[in-house]
């Protein structure tokens, strides 16, 4: 089978297909020059001692160091901070550049466990347990050797220049009951301060969301199929999962 990155090339519904309901009588319009529209959102106040308050309900999803360079990760942190929102580490751990430039940084915990460091969990503002990605729900991935330079290899405890297969599921839990235990473990490591996200690839969103909430997640992240990935089977990218819309 063919391995490639990015998202689906086929035409799927996207955000350009959205239409919005305007205000009239049943919903009174605001005068923009003297009234404000509050777009802030609080994430994590269900259980976390330190929930995150974002100025806008739009965040930057995970893109790993290795797929992106240190300058790009720093730029994402600066941009997110300027807009009052969060950015996400992606697979492979946390860089000093990204942490230093990000007001709110979400740390991803993936099945591969690449770069996983309890100290970095405590430095993050939230933790995102990645069960799956929209571009490959239920499937693993491939970290190409050409991306594994000396720094990436050191962060992920891998040999330089060798292709690495990423697991399709976490090695230490197999279902929602185990997930509840894992969430409790992460809360204890971080002194119950950090919001815990659960990220799933959009495939069975009703059931997956129900199980994630039941397991104790503060936030559920649904990743649509066109979200993209670093590398996986082409058939997954094109034909598995459902679009965000």
PLM regions with names:
Residues 108-114, 153-157, 242:
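Glycine-/small-residue-rich beta-strand-loop submotif within the FAD-binding core of flavoenzymes
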Residues 1-58, 62-81, 85-86, 93-94, ...:
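Conserved, well-structured core domains of diverse proteins
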Residues 170-245:
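Glycine-rich phosphate/ribose-binding loops and adjacent secondary-structure elements
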Residues 57-63, 163-170, 230-237:
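Glycine- and acidic
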Residues 61, 88-90, 108, 130-132, ...:
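Generic beta-strand/beta-sheet core signal
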Residues 70, 74, 83, 143, ...:
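Internal alpha/beta core interface subdomains
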Residues 98, 105-106, 145-152, 229-244:
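C-terminal helical cap(s) of enzyme catalytic domains, especially alpha/beta-barrels
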Residues 127-132, 151-160, 221-225:
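Non-cysteine beta-strand/loop elements that form the S-adenosyl-L-methionine
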């Amino acid at each position: 089978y063919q391995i490639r990155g990015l998202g689906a090339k086929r035409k799927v519904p996207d955000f350009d297909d959205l239409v919005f309901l305007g205000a009239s009588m049943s919903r009174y319009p605001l005068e923009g020059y003297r009234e404000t529209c509050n777009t802030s959102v609080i994430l994590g106040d269900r259980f976390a001692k330190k929930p995150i308050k974002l100025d806008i309900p739009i965040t930057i999803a995970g893109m790993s160091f290795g797929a992106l360079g240190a300058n790009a990760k720093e730029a994402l942190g600066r941009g997110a901070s300027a807009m009052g929102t969060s950015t996400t580490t992606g697979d492979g751990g946390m860089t000093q550049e990204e942490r230093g430039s990000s007001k709110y940084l979400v740390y991803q915990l993936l099945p591969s466990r690449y770069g996983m460091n309890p100290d970095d969990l405590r430095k993050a503002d939230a933790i995102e347990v990645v069960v799956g990605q929209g571009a490959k729900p239920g499937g693993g991935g491939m970290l190409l050797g050409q991306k594994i330079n000396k720094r990436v290899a050191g962060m992920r405890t891998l040999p330089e220049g060798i292709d690495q297969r990423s697991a399709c599921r976490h090695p230490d839990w197999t279902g929602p009951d185990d997930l509840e235990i894992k969430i409790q473990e992460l809360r204890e490591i971080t002194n119950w301060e950090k919001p815990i996200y659960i990220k799933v690839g959009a495939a069975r969103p009703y059931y997956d969301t129900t199980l994630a909430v039941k397991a104790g997640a503060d936030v559920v992240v649904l990743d649509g199929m066109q979200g993209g990935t670093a590398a996986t089977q082409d058939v997954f990218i094109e034909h598995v999962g459902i679009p965000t819309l």
